[in-house]
Swiss-Prot record:
Name recorded for this polypeptide: Probable transaldolase
Source species: Caldicellulosiruptor saccharolyticus (strain ATCC 43494 / DSM 8903 / Tp8T 6331)
Chief place of localization: cytoplasm
Reaction equation(s) it catalyzes: D-sedoheptulose 7-phosphate + D-glyceraldehyde 3-phosphate = D-erythrose 4-phosphate + beta-D-fructose 6-phosphate
Annotated family: Belongs to the transaldolase family. Type 3B subfamily.
Record GO cellular component, one term: cytoplasm
PANTHER family xref list: TRANSALDOLASE (PTHR10683:SF36)
Amino acid sequence: MKLFIDTANINEIKEAYSWGIICGVTTNPSLIAKEGRDFKEVVNEICSIVDGPISAEVISLKAEGMIEEARDLAKIHKNVVIKIPMTTEGLKAVSVLSKEGIKTNVTLIFSAAQALLAAKAGATYVSPFVGRLDDIGQNGIELIKEIVQIFRNYPDIKTEIIAASIRHPIHVIEAAKAGADIATVPFKVLEQMTKHALTDIGIERFLKDWEKVPKKN
C-alpha cells in the first residue's frame, strides 16, 4: 500500500517526504485555508517537493465550473490530480475530464455504490472517508473492504482506492489489511506510526550499555 500525506503545510510535507515513505499529497479547501496563502502558489510549491500525485480540489458545484477549474489546475503541473466531490454534477465532470486525460480523485465517498459510479465515470482514484463513517457509528474499514472486493471482481476497473479521513495508526493498518491501494495520512498520525514505548526503552538501554564500554584515552 502506498502512503500519501494529507496536508497543505509545506513544512510537514518536507519532513514526511524526507523520511522516504510518502509518494503523494492530498489537499482540500479547508487545509489550504489554514495556510493563509494563495491556492495555486501552495499547489505549485507542493509539486516542486513531491514527485507524485498531488490532489487539489475544485470548489464549483456545477459540472461546467468543475471542468473549467480542473483544466486550469491541471496546467500547474503534470502531477496535479483534480479532487471532485461525489455528486451527479461531479460524475459529469469526471466523465469529461477522464476523456481529456486529466486525472481525478472523487472525494467524499461514503458508500460502495458511490465508489462504483465514480469508477464507471472514469475516476483515477476514489476516496472513501473512514473516520467520518466511524464518527456516525458505521464502519469505515468495512466500506474499504466492500470497494476492494467490487473492484477486484472487474479487472477493467483501474480506479485506485485511497483510504481517507484517517484518524489514527490503526486506521492505516486496517486499510492496508483491507487491500486499499493508498492511505492518505495526516502528519500527526505519521508521527504516531513511528513511535512505540518499547522502542524508546530499547534505545535508552542501548545508550546506557554503551556508556559502560571502556573508552581509550
